[in-house]
Swiss-Prot record:
Entry keywords, A to Z: Golgi apparatus, GTP-binding, Lipoprotein, Magnesium, Membrane, Metal-binding, Myristate, Nucleotide-binding
Protein's name in the database: ADP-ribosylation factor-like protein 1
Residues that coordinate or bind Mg(2+): 31, 48
Xref: PANTHER family: ADP RIBOSYLATION FACTOR-RELATED
Residues that, per the record, bind GTP: 24-31, 45-48, 70, 126-129, 160-161
SUPFAM superfamilies: P-loop containing nucleoside triphosphate hydrolases
Annotated family: Belongs to the small GTPase superfamily. Arf family.
Biological process (GO), any one: protein localization to Golgi apparatus
Protein's cellular compartments: Golgi apparatus membrane; Golgi apparatus, trans-Golgi network membrane; Membrane
Length: 181
């Protein structure tokens, strides 16, 4: 009986915890983004070996956010975390032109997974504060995003260190998740 009332309460007040994965190649800024979202400031990070998991509350929605390491040796284990994922934040280093093809390959492989079929995709074109950064449009084309017909997606111009673009991206994600319920 208590479970019934708590589920009604949750549906009325939006307290269901959403599962979000933050994925991308190593050095893209995933961990910086996670802690910027959680504590609102830049924290010193080291390369993630394995994962970081934190609860982030944004606009009355609770997110269980999983930041998975992006090194070549860790990427095959991403699939172990796909189950019950509501959205993927895919972070791309806008300055890393040499690895945009690898980033695309990882993104395509991930999106082919059945467990992520219904997950919303948010791409963070990160490090936009750098002069040599690709534009979000250039990145979207390089990643093949316009070809995604059966998936809700959006790309945002972000800088994890400056905090720019994160609110817009999270606002879009929250509204998109709410419209699905």
């Amino acid at each position: 009986m208590g479970g019934f009332f708590s589920s009604i309460f949750s549906s009325l007040f939006g307290t269901r915890e959403m599962r979000i994965l933050i994925l991308g190649l190593d050095g893209a800024g995933k961990t910086t983004i996670l802690y910027r979202l959680q504590v609102g400031e830049v924290v010193t990070t080291i390369p993630t070996i394995g994962f970081n998991v934190e609860t982030v509350t944004y606009k009355n929605l609770k997110f269980q956010v999983w930041d998975l390491g992006g090194q070549t040796s860790i990427r095959p284990y991403w699939r172990c975390y796909y189950s019950n994922t509501d959205a993927v934040i895919y972070v791309v280093d806008s300055c890393d032109r040499d690895r945009i093809g690898i980033s695309k390959s990882e993104l395509v492989a991930m999106l082919e997974e059945e467990e992520l079929r219904k997950a919303i995709l948010v791409v963070f074109a990160n490090k936009q504060d750098m002069e040599q950064a690709m534009t979000p449009s250039e990145m979207a084309n390089s990643l093949g995003l316009p070809a995604l017909k059966d998936r809700k997606w959006q790309i945002f111009k972000t800088s994890a260190t400056k905090g720019t673009g994160l609110d817009e991206a999270m606002e879009w994600l929250v509204e998109t998740l709410k419209s699905r319920q």
